[in-house]
Amino acid sequence: MHKAIYGFIVSLVFTSALSFSDAGVADEEVDYSLESAYFSTIASGHLEAVRKAPGVVSVITAADIASMGATHLDEVLETVPGLHVLRSDLSRLEPVYSIRGLQSGFNPQVLILFNGVEFKTPFSEGTPPMFRLPLNMIERIEVIKGASSALYGANAYSGVINIISKRVGDYIPAIVQVKNGSFHSRDITTQHREANDEGAGFFFSIEHQTSAGDSKRIVDQDLQTIIDQQSGTRSSLAAGDLNTDYSVTSMLLNVENDVWSWNNWFWENKGAGTGQGVARALDNDGYVDSSSYMSHLQYKQIIDFERAIESNLTYHYLDSKNYFKLFPSGSLIPIGNDGNPFTPINNPVLFEDGVIGAPEYNAHKVIADVTYQYIGFEDQIWRSQFGFQYTSFETSERKNYGPGVLDGTVSPINGDLTDVTGLPYVFLEDQKRRNVFFAVQNQWYFHPDWTLTVGGRWDRYSEFGSIFNPRLGLVWEPRHDFTGKLLYGEAFRAPSFSELYMKNNPSGIGSASLLPERIKTYEIVADYQVAPSLRLINSVYFYKAEDLIENKLVGSVYQFQNAAQQEGYGLEIEAQWVLSSQLKLKGQYSYQHSENTDTGEVIADVPNHTGYLSIDYKMLNDWALHLNNHWIGSSARERTDTRNTLSGYAWSTLKVSKAFEQHNLETAVIVKNLFDENARTPSSPIIPGDYPLEGRSIWAEITYSF
């Protein structure tokens, strides 16, 4: 913990020194407005100043991303107040975006958008498997916290993250960028833009990232260790390192003119490591091949001074091919008469080549919507939207265990896999989902100082029927430098296909009678522009979530159930301070308390306190320095977990860059986890030492513009 304190002291001392050295400049009038850089569409569907928006909005620009030395999306999102990125204990250390204490291992409570279009997988309702997103194609990221289903429908539950890509209309120089870093990591980017005088043209970007992962992320014990102790075998790969290698490709092609735009985005993570293993048994042979392709056609037209229309048509394809060694070669596993591990009436079975599963799925999704905006009524903006979604989901599976393959009476078993595709023994049968929706919203500027936003959205799903979610926002601006907000919203989270229809899976089966999760959020916000260079934002919130879906033991079988209620409250404080034209400071502090209202237990694995402080300093001769510190507080354990509270940590990143403008060249050195903090993210008791995060890494970056 002394490193955490030391990191913050370094930042504060550094800031003080720079403030004194630049005092003459700081006292001058700064030709900079924080508000001018921060406009957003995420809160209301049309462009407006963030501080006037009916929501709690954070905006991270491409310039912010470039200065902080981040290489993937998770590092950027960690800077948002109230948002903490964990690693999933259930799903191969995939990112979990915990917002205000709301989270689960598959990340379905946060809606992720790409240019305003969702790209979740219907299997889990979270991001595509092993999702890791490079950053150079991103123009800005907009985040709204709180219930937002009145605008965005399902899964806009704890918040919405909209990733907005660069496009023809943005001034983007052609670049080639190469980064080399620790753990045999390499990132390569090339981008190019062509446009005519009318603004028509194209933008193309391709990014490729590879890494072998940090081999020092060691876990001393896993589930196979426990099985070895009980069965007398020695099959566990622990102590061993987490399997965190990746090979990510992201390609974007944007073609547009003044009214049409066509965005095509391809993303792939090929041969990705399986983290701690899908059964929490280390797996050095398993991998995930995950890919996503999205084609989005948009038409936007201002009809006249009062009316505007926007229509969108999107096709999204997802594909996931997996090879999992649930338990390693030579493991002796109790197999029930249904062929699954650990089910009742079992016999020990020796798996010579390991317990192997190779599930695959692909999903096709079509989304269409039309939005109409009308400002013909005095002091009002009316917005209405109608649309539909159609999803088809197809599965296949090969394995050497489970129903239709084993009955627990034959031993040993080798690595030959049985194809159960199309049979009743597959993990999930093919599915389809249909959803139609209608939304309406009115923003009424009924007084020069007051704006009232009222809206709602009706959704109808083929599985569970209709649901309606309202919103209400009152914005008060008594002075040009102060804004107050009262916000209320409701949201729902649709059950995923796995929660509804999973079968032949010892870790949990679905329940077709599941209801959507529901939430109500209340919030008070004060946004104060203390000076042209200093902005303070404070928010206090309360929420109540119902019908949360959990995997519960029903008889002798784990099954997904609407089994929990949760309440939470908290405080978020954010400051943005431009001390001079050379020096900028950002900081935030968040506190949250959330608990299960049925049991009174504090929600585990979520820090109550988090903080962030960053410094950007543009020095003489085109040198620049960025230093940031994340402070993550301690996290409580589950009531049945006898381990000590998980300690907090501080994570510091330093970037030093030098521009050679006459040569269109920039070089940089980036150091992540600057103080080599022993940072850990929570695990289940099966892996008692928690999951270590990456140690210190050093990167060299070179960018050429032309």
Regions found by a protein language model. Name each.
Residues 24-66, 74:
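Short, acidic, small-residue-rich periplasmic hinge/interaction motif at the N-terminus
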Residues 31, 42, 74, 78-117, ...:
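Extracytoplasmic beta-strand/coil segments of soluble accessory domains associated
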Residues 117-145:
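Short acidic/polar hinge/loop motifs at secondary-structure boundaries
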Residues 150, 162, 170-171, 179, ...:
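Periplasmic-side early beta-strands and strand-to-turn transitions of outer-membrane beta-barrels
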Residues 193, 249-251, 269, 288, ...:
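Conserved C-terminal beta-signal and adjacent last beta-strands/turns
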Residues 254-269, 291-464, 475, 534-540, ...:
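Face-selective signature of the C-terminal outer-membrane beta-barrel domain
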Residues 288-302, 427-433, 490-545, 552-578, ...:
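Outer-membrane beta-barrel signature, preferentially recognizing the C-terminal barrel domain
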Residues 445-451, 540-544, 562-639, 675, ...:
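Gram-negative outer-membrane beta-barrel transporters
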